[in-house]
């Protein structure tokens, strides 16, 4: 390359962008607001309760026990809801992103909202 300073600036910019993107993707979520958790409870009762149960567990079924879902794994939760997993159907065409976020907020409370 003819201009090593230009190359270093571009490389530095790319590294900063990549690290910021990685940090944003892997950050631990702050505690959800009570309002968002209450909205999530309503969506949970409408869309999730039949399979996952009133208390986030449905004994005697193959449904995942949501009480045990890692509270720091938002990306996994969003992916599972959007695309489905095992016997869970995908909800990405039915639920809006803000509704999924609200359900995630409720799940993080362990059903204590």
Question: What is the predicted function of each stretch?
Answer:
Residues 8-17:
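Bacterial N-terminal signal peptides
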Residues 21-43:
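Electrostatic cytochrome c docking/interface patches
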Residues 1-8:
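Bacterial N-terminal signal peptides that target proteins for export
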Residues 48-51:
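Short cysteine clusters
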Residues 34-41, 53-82:
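Gly/Gly-Pro-rich "capping" loops immediately C-terminal to redox-active cysteine motifs
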Residues 59-67, 82-113:
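Axial heme c-ligation environment in periplasmic c-type cytochrome domains
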Residues 45-46, 83:
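Charged, alpha-helical scaffolding/interaction elements associated with membrane systems
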């Amino acid at each position: 390359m003819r201009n090593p300073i230009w190359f270093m600036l571009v490389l530095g910019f790319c590294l900063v962008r990549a690290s910021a993107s990685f940090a944003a993707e892997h950050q631990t979520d702050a505690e959800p607001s009570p309002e968002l958790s209450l909205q999530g409870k309503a969506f949970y009762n409408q869309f999730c309760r039949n399979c996952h149960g009133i208390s986030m567990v449905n004994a005697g079924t193959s449904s995942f026990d949501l009480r045990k879902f890692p509270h720091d794994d938002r990306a996994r939760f969003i992916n599972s809801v959007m695309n489905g997993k095992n016997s869970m159907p995908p909800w990405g065409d039915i639920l809006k992103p803000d509704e999924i976020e609200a359900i995630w907020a409720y799940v993080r409370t362990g059903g204590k909202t």
